[in-house]
Amino acid sequence: MTGLNQRVNELQAEMKALGLDGFIVTNPSNLLYLSQFDGLDGDGCLVITPQQVTLITDARYQEALEASLPKTVNLEITRDYYDVAHQVLADRGYQRVGFETSASYALYRKLAALFGDKLVPETGVIEKLREVKDTNEVAILRRSTQLASKGFEALMSYAKVGVTERQVSNWLNNWMLEHGAQKPSFDTIVASGFRSALPHGSATDKQLAEGEVVTVDFGYYVDGYTSDVTRTFALGDPGAELRKVYATVHEAQERMFQVIKPGANGQQVDSAGRDYIADEGYGKYYNHGSGHGIGLDIHEGPNFGPRWRSNVITENNVMTVEP
């Protein structure tokens, strides 16, 4: 549990910098990150203080948690998660308690009733820590992405003229689950022909046709971490114009790869691809971002886009690059 202790220590350091003497964690991915227990699904919360860590949940998870939690984490079993969280912090004479602004409004009202004006909204504190992956996280993400690549290679034997987009999506889903993936991180996108221009084109009953390009965008969890892979291929000869579009996007991606390094920001990475695509005459069609971090969630930081100058790349970020 060395990784767990380091993560908690990093959060406690951030709390000190923010002047917080407590932090209530409710976001499911952040709970998993800080507890390393993949089973709560949002049922409970973590209370972090400078001196201790308390996991509050109910009896459904008690046996599994008692067998896996390190001794440094206190376990409280109750259905009144937030009343107990308040008591844990009250015992320590809290003054400023952070909570995640991603919490629902109903949860915010509950916390506000308990903590009053001592409740401090904080955005992205834990998410920022999650952007920098440790060695184990990088290894898992590599396995996750390698499995996705194998899945796409296998799909090529099935994705033929006459098969529908939905059938392609279902085939890939079955293959991924049968070969070790836990679940998809989003509904697999299969968009063929004119629909391949849609950034988020859900699979339909449209049949794949000769001469069309097909875009497949998918991600699957392995050991809690998700891949995010987009591949485009042609059925037969798509024609000169589509070959040019494909080559343009590929070159844009290569130019973005050259920019990505510690210290570069999301706007710089985006511009490396976006400017090239515009120079080739396709700029007006570039209506989406250029990439993002991946990890416990399909969308994490850092982000690549015209508005993301503040997102600076650091060592051990893991990112998609998708112009």
Q: What residues fall within each predicted segment?
A:
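Active-site neighborhoods and metal-handling regions in enzymes and metal-associated proteins
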Residues: 1-323
